[in-house]
């Protein structure tokens, strides 16, 4: 092994991308390597507590330039609706001079990126190796981001007849297609021009999709494993939730969260609340206030709060999701199946019910429910609407001990969890990935 290397990280300005990049940075720093993490100034405060090695991981703040159409002060994807994503993308591209100045001054060995398609070209000029690092699933990349791919249509040779879109997914495809064409160009350009492809996944879950991407791009795909964060024992579950959950029997509580990007329409939000009530089980729902509402309370169905006051909570702020999933009282996780939440569900003991909204979430859902058969998807109408009855039926089907479907997904989930948490599996991915990077840097230095 040669000397330690210095890596730059430049992820898309969304916390769903920056946070797993920082988890990877922690793994590199744990092995003695240095990381310079480029991000918007506003994002630094929210990420600092995830930095376990502040002496080796240095945040390098970028000034986000003004772009017509981008609201004043918006610096991350959580500051804007999805429809304004193209303006944040334009602002990211305008940071190129700042990024290049940092590369010139600090001379890293590697630079990790995802949507900034111009990084490989810039990196080559400075003799830096570029690594495109995906924090979305391999199935999404295989379905959407191979050369010549078309939104919603599986490409030739795609390795699954189950991980696909259905007719009622048109609502999500339509929403995403607003800026899909440009995003597709950015990512496929990055894939074609980068030195190495890496994905936050493991072959036990997505091996055939990784093999397919390798064949399409004719280069090795490096896997990091899911890069789950280390448990933060210094920050136990808030007393508010610990005391509330302790009231209920083991495995009886439904926990529902739909990610930071999803804001429901008011009528769909109310249907979600009523579906939870219909199960008759205790529940904790953590979602953003719906469109047109400033608070959760003003949007709740009439009489709902009084009816569920002893066994149901709807919360509009951030919660400690991994710690809630680990609480003995929680037995079911209703999730949008974003890639991070997907992994958290797989290594939990909870039954899994899926309610996807965005394109990659839909494909992750089909992987989980149809390919791996470890979860149940909530049935939707052609418009994308789900009813309180369909939500309640999905939850009841996995929570009922006598349900044939519930027993099937419970058995399959338990087997898969056993594989994923087996000693050495996930650390093995990290070790091999870091060793490969070290060899890449050593070989480059010998050129």
UniProtKB/Swiss-Prot annotation:
Keywords: Glycosyltransferase, Transferase. The keyword Cell inner membrane does not apply. The keyword Glycosyltransferase applies. It comes from the Eukaryota. Gene3D superfamilies: Glycogen Phosphorylase B (3.40.50.2000). UDP-alpha-D-glucose binds at residues 260, 319-321, 336-344, 358-361. It holds the Pfam family UDPGT. SUPFAM superfamilies: UDP-Glycosyltransferase/glycogen phosphorylase. It is an enzyme of class 2 (transferase). Its EC number is 2.4.1.-. GO terms for molecular function: UDP-glucosyltransferase activity. Belongs to the UDP-glycosyltransferase family. This is UDP-glycosyltransferase 79B9. It comes from Arabidopsis thaliana (Mouse-ear cress).
